[in-house]
Amino acid sequence: MLRREEVERIKEQYPKGTPIRLYSMEGEQTVPPGSRGVVDHVDDIGQIHMKWENGSSLALNVEEDRF
């Protein structure tokens, strides 16, 4: 689990509307590699909730996913 300081850094680095391209995602594969999306928000455990171009809203895990 991320420390509070790490979560705050992620929130500062990825504000709402930040564009992101996915390279790989662990676990669920509803978002294919190469997909683009924008940040909706970062939650209190540091997951980046997205609005993906394919309509998915699956969150990114900064410790496991590559983007």
What is the predicted role of each segment?
Residues 1-67:
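Basic/aromatic-rich interaction segments and small domains that mediate binding to polyanionic partners
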